[in-house]
Every structure is written in C-alpha cells, then in structure tokens.
C-alpha cells in the first residue's frame, strides 16, 4: 500500500482554497466593471476623416459676412432702374408746384418821385436825395449824392459837391429843344451843359452815344469827358439823355413831350453810366388825376299848391265899439 503524504494533502487543500478564492474574486471583478463603465460620460463622437471622402469640384461657400443695412431707395427709383445718364435732360417740373412769381414790366418802382412842374416822374437812384431846385434856370429836379448819414434826426445828410444830377422838361429854354431827333438833342444838350458847368479850357475825350428805351418810348444819350488844360483839375465828366417824342407837324398837336437828364461828375467821383441810363429810362409822363365827379343835381323844390286848394287864413273879427247918441 502506498502511504499518503499528509503534507501533500494539506498542500492540495491549500491549492483548492486558493483556487476557490481566485474564482470568487474574478466573479466580483466581472460584475463591478460594467457598473463602473456606465458611470463615465458619453464618449466623444468619432472625428470624421476627410482623407477617405472623395474630392469635391464645387467651391465651398464663403462664410457669411456681417449683414449691413441697405440704404433707403430713392423715391423715383425702381428695382430694375439703370444708372442715370449724366447727359439726360432734367426731369419735368412738378405740375402741382406753384408757379414762380411774375414781375410785371409796368410794376411801380420803389422810391418813385413825382415832379409836377416838369410833368414827369422818375425812380430815385440809390444813394441820392432830392435837393431844392428853385434857384435853377434849367430843369425842375436836382439830385445830390449823399456822403454819410444825417448829423441829427430831421436834418439833410451831407452831400458831395463834385457831382449832381439835373432833370426837367426839354422846353424852349434850352437850345437842344430845337433839334428834331433825340440823338441830336442829347448831343447838343451835352455840349451846352458842358460849357455851362465846366467853363475851363480843355479837350473832350472818350465820347459815347447810347440808345434809350423808357417803357416803349425811345431816346438817346451822349457822354464825354473833358481833360482840362490845368493838370491840377481832375477830368470832368458829363452824361446827357433825352427821352420822349418831339413835336408833331400837325397844327393841332400838343406841346412836345421830351425830358432830359444831365449827370455831372469828375474823375474823383465818376458818372455811373448804368445808373444814369436806368434813371433816364425810368421817366414816365405824369398823368393828371381824373377830375372829381360832378355833384349830383339837387332835388327840385316842391311845386306850390293850386290856388283853389289854398286854405283860407282864419281872421279874428275886430270888436265894434258903439258910440253914445
């Protein structure tokens, strides 16, 4: 008989116990691992691999830009409107717009002065005032150029002493009235007035002639300068204009309706030719106001009553006194 080694039995028992313990531990680990895995976060999605995808022929769309608010469309533009042509005609005016103000050609001019003595009216030039013309032998209106404001209220302003304007009717006091045409009358008037106001030796220079039109009434003007022999004197200047209609040949024609303007100046205070022309063309005949209407006829007095219808005047009987016998 074989004798069993007691140590071998004990070793086998120990090995069996160790094997049982190892199996129990393995089962515990197998059960615990799934529980621990379920508590972890979800795994990240797999990264797509571009290498495996086929190349695309279409370009990728660009990233959207930041949106910008479009400008407000013009009122007259349409969605399909083309750019405007710089050479195109301007659009027609709005038919509902108010028309521009129309200035009447015969509108009264500002600061208009009536001259009853000469029978005309005129527009006062800017910067000029009317002066006293009572001591003048020729003309009925005298204008002076102001050089400043009046020193005190109610007093006339200071005026220049080297320039003046004379206006009046071209009557028989002036030799120029005998000239049949306005151009000859203006030249004659300029020559006579030049000798009267500038009686110094000299030479006439820079002579001019200008046509005038005063609201349909024709006229003419003459201008020249005088270079005096005395070099200390500034050149004199004179502008003369005649406007109106000369006398007609008809026996029943009225007096001639012609007026004149004489503008005197110097090189230090020259004649304003444009203002002189405007002054002459502003002359208008002074129309007398219409006569006052005749008074209405008085109501007739009532007719006297017929004689048969006159009521008798009551009379009081005179008392009679009886005398004693």
UniProtKB/Swiss-Prot annotation:
Glycans are attached at residues 49, 57, 66, 316. Glycosylated, with mannose residues. The secreted protein has from 0 to 9 mannose residues, the majority have 6, 7, or 8 mannose residues (22, 24 and 17% respectively). Deglycosylated molecules had a significantly lower capacity to elicit a DTH reaction in guinea pigs in vivo or to activate specific T lymphocytes in vitro. Pretreating mouse macrophages with mannan decreases binding of M.tuberculosis. The non-glycosylated form stimulates IFN-gamma production however, so glycosylation is not essential. GO terms for biological process: cellular response to starvation. Sequence repeats lie at residues 85-88, 94-97, 104-107. Residues 49-60, 75-87, 306-325 have a biased composition (Low complexity). Residues 61-74, 88-103, 287-305 have a biased composition (Pro residues). It is found in: Secreted; Cell surface. Residues 85-107 are annotated as: 3 X 4 AA approximate repeats of [DA]-P-N-A. One of its GO terms (molecular function) is extracellular matrix binding. Major immunodominant antigen that has potential as a vaccine against tuberculosis. Can be used as a DNA vaccine in guinea pigs. Apa-ELISA could be used in diagnosis. Belongs to the Apa family. A potent antigen in animals immunized with live bacteria, it induces a strong delayed-type hypersensitivity (DTH) in immunized animals. Elicits a mostly Th1 type of T-cell response in healthy humans; induces IFN-gamma production from CD4(+) and CD8(+) cells. Functions as an adhesin, binds to mouse macrophages via mannose residues. Might interact via host CD209. This is Alanine and proline-rich secreted protein Apa.
């Amino acid at each position: 008989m074989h004798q069993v080694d007691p140590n071998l039995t004990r070793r086998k028992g120990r090995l069996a116990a160790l094997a049982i313990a190892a199996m129990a531990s393995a089962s515990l680990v197998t059960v615990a691992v799934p529980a621990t895995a379920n508590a972890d976060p979800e795994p990240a999605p797999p990264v797509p691999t571009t290498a495996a995808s086929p190349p695309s022929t279409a370009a990728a769309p660009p990233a959207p830009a930041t949106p910008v608010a479009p400008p407000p469309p013009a009122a007259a533009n349409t969605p399909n409107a083309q750019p405007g042509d710089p050479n195109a005609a301007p659009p027609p005016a709005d038919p509902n717009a108010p028309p521009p103000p129309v200035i009447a050609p015969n509108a009264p001019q500002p600061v208009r002065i009536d001259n009853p003595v000469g029978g005309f009216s005129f527009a006062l030039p800017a910067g000029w005032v009317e002066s006293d013309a009572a001591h003048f032998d020729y003309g009925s209106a005298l204008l002076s150029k102001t050089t400043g404001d009046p020193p005190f209220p109610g007093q006339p302003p200071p005026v220049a002493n080297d320039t003046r304007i004379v206006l009046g009717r071209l009557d028989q006091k002036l030799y120029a009235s005998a000239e049949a045409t306005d151009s000859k009358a203006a030249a004659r008037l300029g020559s006579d007035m030049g000798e009267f106001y500038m009686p110094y030796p000299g030479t006439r220079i820079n002579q001019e002639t200008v046509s005038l039109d005063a609201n349909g009434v024709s006229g003419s003007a003459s201008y020249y300068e005088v270079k005096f022999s005395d070099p200390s004197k500034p050149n004199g200047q004179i502008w003369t204009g005649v406007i109106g209609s000369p006398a007609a040949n008809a026996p029943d024609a009225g007096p001639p309706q012609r007026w004149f303007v004489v503008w005197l100046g110097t090189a230090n205070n020259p004649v304003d030719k444009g203002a002189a022309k405007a002054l002459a063309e502003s002359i208008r005949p002074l129309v007398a106001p219409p006569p006052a209407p005749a008074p209405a006829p008085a109501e007739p007095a009532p007719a006297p009553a017929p004689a048969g219808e006159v009521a008798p005047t009551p009379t009081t009987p005179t008392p009679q006194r009886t005398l004693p016998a």
